[in-house]
Swiss-Prot record:
The encoding gene: rpsD
One function term, GO molecular function aspect: rRNA binding
SMART domains in alphabetical order: Ribosomal_S4, S4
Protein name as catalogued: Small ribosomal subunit protein uS4
GO biological process, one term: translation
Quaternary organization: Part of the 30S ribosomal subunit. Contacts protein S5. The interaction surface between S4 and S5 is involved in control of translational fidelity.
Organism, as annotated: Roseiflexus sp. (strain RS-1)
Keyword vocabulary terms for this entry: Ribonucleoprotein, Ribosomal protein, RNA-binding, rRNA-binding
Function: One of the primary rRNA binding proteins, it binds directly to 16S rRNA where it nucleates assembly of the body of the 30S subunit. With S5 and S12 plays an important role in translational accuracy.
Bridged cysteine pairs (disulfide): none
Family affiliation: Belongs to the universal ribosomal protein uS4 family.
Classification via NCBIfam families: PRK05327.1, rpsD_bact
InterPro entries: Ribosomal_uS4 (IPR022801), Ribosomal_uS4_bac-type (IPR005709), Ribosomal_uS4_CS (IPR018079), Ribosomal_uS4_N (IPR001912), S4_RNA-bd (IPR002942), S4_RNA-bd_sf (IPR036986)
Length: 206
């Protein structure tokens, strides 16, 4: 299955959660499922399985992860002691593409994934082009010196967008040199809200 590249508004309305900032804005304006019935449409009663599937799909679309990758991340989370659902989201937050997004180097996770894949990002000074790379405490994530000359990255600094960007507590941003450091492990509450991780655990425990 390919990564979703269709209208983010439509899928956000179908899932009932904004999968990007744009999706959130569209959902706020039209908080009902897509289709001909419009605002009068009600979300259908769904089975327990349907609810579990919906929560899994929410997480997959928000973080931009394919089904096979998502299942591998879940299986890795199962090996940790404690709550599997919480560790699932901690692992999703530690993905390099997500960290690039959280640091404000990209406006969406899809764009962050592209920046990583195209070789614009380094981890501890070494070019890393694997979006699924799991960051560790103490690592420095930065834009490659060769890439900083590009108009896009110059505008990030000149516009003041990075200086205004609010990063989560587990990351420390240095806007001047387009770098950031992982200073702590993310917590479940640092991850995307509005997703019930317990239903995801139940989905894979069937």
């Amino acid at each position: 299955m390919a990564r979703y590249r269709g209208p983010v508004g439509k899928v956000s309305r179908r899932l009932g959660i904004g999968i990007t900032d744009k999706g959130q804005r569209i959902l706020a304006k039209r908080p009902f499922p897509p289709g001909q019935h419009g605002p009068s449409a009600r979300r259908r009663q769904v089975s327990d399985y349907g609810l579990q599937l919906l929560e899994k799909q929410k997480a997959r679309y928000v973080y931009g992860v394919l089904e096979r990758q998502f299942r591998r991340i879940f299986e890795k989370a199962q090996r940790f002691p404690g709550e599997t659902g919480a560790y699932l989201f901690i692992l999703l937050e530690r993905r390099l593409d997500n960290v690039v997004y959280r640091l404000g180097f990209a406006t969406t996770r899809a764009q962050a994934r592209q920046l990583v894949s195209h070789g614009h990002i380094t981890v501890n000074g070494r070019k890393t082009n694997i979006p699924s790379y799991t960051v560790r405490v103490g690592e420095t994530i930065a834009v490659r010196p060769e890439s900083r000359r590009r108009t896009y990255f110059k505008n990030l600094i000149d516009s003041g967008a990075l200086a205004r960007h609010k990063t989560p507590d587990w990351l420390r941003l240095n806007p001047a040199d387009l770098s950031g450091e992982v200073v702590a492990m993310p917590r479940r509450e640092d991850a995307e809200p509005g997703i019930n991780e317990q239903l995801i655990v139940e989905f894979y425990s069937r």
